């Protein structure tokens, strides 16, 4: 990078996961970076006042690759704190049976990590860099007509304007940056609330001195009940972050905490013992219900400003790709800057076309996967097909890849390409299935004919 390029200034709005990684990535390339965040520093907030709308994260190949791209040593430090999950553990409605469904063809795992912990790790990494972080700064105005000027209201209620060469919005699904950027360009935009709520619950560590985990830590636990479900992901301290998902009508149809406990006794009997009746009652009365929303827009940049992560493509959490996809946004943008020899404006312009199909694909896939997690994981036909898919993957190695493998463990395969491959493989499986059924039918008719002839 030339001295002129390295002096370029970058303003980033949003110090969540994607904003922090973007700040680290730009700083690694030698740019002068300032990061703004509406909230106070989360590391200074009492942990008892943590956000109870936070679903645990599953870090997989795409997220890891992005972390390694920015700083391999940082990636290693973060990955020391994850818990590998080799598959799903399905809990039946009796509370007496559990079934493991492995994820990877070759023992691959996705990795559980607490969202707040990861965010704090990235903020700690930023403290070691030359990035300037300004908390309690609310964006109220953005102008990219010449230089990029952003106006903020700070913690003292004073207005401050800062000027940058380029600006980046990573401030989430309800992005103020996106709202202001839309005024500067022709951006298609839509948002859709999904008829689904989530309520965070907590499974405490076991009191067993020999094992702090009350259930298997190396699985993502699912209690599938068709139109609602419960999940649980392990934390390093032996606890599990558990989340109850349901249509709003289900949770709103429960009128009291005692009724909520009874609902759990009936639908998740083994989970009641893990969470505790008092904790369930308290959670129903006190914990907030989170909404699920999908956001889509296009293009993502006007050449001076760009949106990444949930600000550009908020998705439902059912494929575990929200954070992984946002981190991948950062890596792909950085690679475009490299390809264009440091020309950030050209990289911003190319980013939208390079990313759109993949972002549309994963948003749809995430929504579709709710049905798989809540219902299909106990369907015999689905399980037979998954077993065949897995077996073909083991036999034909890289010639046949299950969709989950491509999405979670093959960061070299774009999301849209993975779906194309899966559609082709489904056609092959369907044709093979029809062929097998046809052969069986012909065989049956022949045998019936032989039997009939013997009777004559």
Curated annotation (Swiss-Prot):
Q: Which GO terms describe its biological process?
A: 'de novo' NAD biosynthetic process from L-tryptophan; anthranilate metabolic process; cellular response to starvation; filamentous growth; filamentous growth of a population of unicellular organisms in response to biotic stimulus; filamentous growth of a population of unicellular organisms in response to starvation; kynurenine metabolic process; L-tryptophan catabolic process
Identify the pathway: Cofactor biosynthesis; NAD(+) biosynthesis; quinolinate from L-kynurenine: step 1/3
Q: Which EC class is this protein assigned?
A: oxidoreductase
State the source organism's domain of life.
Eukaryota
Q: Where's it found, cell-wise?
A: Mitochondrion outer membrane
Cofactor annotation: FAD
Its recorded name reads Kynurenine 3-monooxygenase
């Amino acid at each position: 990078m030339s001295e002129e390029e390295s002096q370029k200034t970058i303003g980033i709005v949003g110090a969540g996961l994607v904003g922090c990684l973007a700040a680290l990535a730009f700083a690694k390339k030698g740019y002068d970076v300032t990061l703004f965040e509406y909230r106070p520093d989360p590391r200074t907030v009492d942990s008892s006042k943590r956000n109870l709308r936070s679903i645990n994260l599953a870090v997989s190949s795409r997220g890891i690759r992005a972390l390694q791209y920015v700083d391999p040593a940082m990636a290693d430090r973060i990955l020391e704190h994850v818990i590998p999950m080799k598959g799903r553990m399905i809990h039946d409605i009796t509370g007496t049976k559990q079934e493991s469904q492995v994820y990877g063809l070759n023992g691959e795992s996705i990795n559980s990590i607490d969202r707040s912990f990861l965010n704090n790790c990235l903020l700690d990494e930023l403290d070691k860099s030359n990035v300037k972080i300004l908390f309690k700064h609310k964006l109220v105005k953005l102008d990219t007509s010449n230089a990029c000027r952003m106006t903020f209201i700070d913690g003292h209620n004073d207005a401050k304007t800062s000027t940058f060469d380029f600006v980046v919005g990573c401030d989430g699904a309800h992005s103020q940056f996106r709202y202001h950027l839309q005024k500067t360009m022709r951006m298609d935009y839509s948002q859709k609330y999904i008829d689904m709520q989530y309520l965070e619950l907590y499974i405490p560590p076991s009191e067993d001195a020999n094992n702090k985990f009350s259930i298997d830590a190396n699985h993502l636990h699912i209690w599938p009940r068709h139109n609602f479900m419960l999940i649980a992901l392990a934390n390093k301290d032996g606890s599990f972050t558990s989340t109850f998902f349901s249509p709003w009508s289900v949770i709103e149809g429960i009128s009291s905490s005692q009724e909520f406990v009874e609902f759990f006794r009936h639908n998740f009997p083994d989970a009641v013992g893990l969470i505790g009746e008092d904790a369930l009652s308290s959670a129903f009365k006190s914990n907030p219900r989170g909404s699920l929303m999908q956001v889509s827009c296009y293009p993502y940049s006007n050449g001076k400003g760009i949106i990444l992560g949930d600000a550009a493509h908020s998705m439902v959490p059912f494929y575990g790709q929200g954070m992984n996809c946002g981190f991948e946004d950062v890596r792909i943008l950085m690679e475009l800057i490299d390809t264009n020899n440091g020309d950030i404006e050209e990289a911003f312009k190319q980013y939208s076309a390079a990313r759109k199909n993949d972002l549309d694909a994963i948003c749809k896939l995430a929504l579709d996967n709710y049905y798989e997690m809540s219902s299909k994981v106990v369907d015999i036909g689905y399980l037979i097909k998954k077993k065949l898919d897995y077996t073909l993957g083991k036999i034909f190695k890289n010639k046949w890849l299950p969709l989950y493998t491509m999405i979670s463990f093959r960061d070299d395969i774009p999301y849209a390409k993975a779906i194309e491959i899966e559609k082709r493989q489904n056609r092959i499986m369907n044709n093979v299935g029809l062929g097998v059924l046809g052969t069986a039918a012909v065989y049956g008719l022949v045998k019936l004919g032989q039997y009939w002839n013997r009777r004559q």
